[in-house]
Amino acid sequence: MSLSKEFKEEIITKFGGTDKNTGKAEVQVALFSNRISDLTGHLQKHPKDKHSRRGLLMLVSKRKKALKYLQNVAIDRYRQVIADLDLRK
């Protein structure tokens, strides 16, 4: 299921500052995280859907790379994103 336009703009504004700032790593991670949670719910209902599982693994990999970049560039922004999205315990 794709994100609604309003919800996507809300995430972009929250993590990027403006609704046009979609390139920030924080925005990318937040959007990936939302899509990952949607796909996780889908896969719990449809465990044999291998194509969606591959898509989920690709999204997790993209999020991991974006978080690694953010950690190397700005550790304070990385910690803030982790806290806001509850990604690490």
Swiss-Prot record:
Q: Which GO terms describe its biological process?
A: translation
Q: Which Pfam families match?
A: Ribosomal_S15
- What is a single cellular component term in the Gene Ontology annotation? cytosolic small ribosomal subunit
Q: Which domain of life is it from?
A: Bacteria
Keywords of the record, alphabetical order, are:
Ribonucleoprotein, Ribosomal protein, RNA-binding, rRNA-binding
Molecular function via GO:
rRNA binding; structural constituent of ribosome
PANTHER family hit by this protein: RIBOSOMAL PROTEIN S15, BACTERIAL AND ORGANELLAR, SMALL RIBOSOMAL SUBUNIT PROTEIN US15M
- Stated role: One of the primary rRNA binding proteins, it binds directly to 16S rRNA where it helps nucleate assembly of the platform of the 30S subunit by binding and bridging several RNA helices of the 16S rRNA.
Spell out the family assignment given in the record's similarity comment: Belongs to the universal ribosomal protein uS15 family.
On subunit structure and binding partners, the annotation says: Part of the 30S ribosomal subunit. Forms a bridge to the 50S subunit in the 70S ribosome, contacting the 23S rRNA.
Under the heading NCBIfam families, the entry gives: S15_bact
Name used for this protein in its record: Small ribosomal subunit protein uS15
Q: Which organism is it from?
A: Chlorobium phaeovibrioides (strain DSM 265 / 1930) (Prosthecochloris vibrioformis (strain DSM 265))
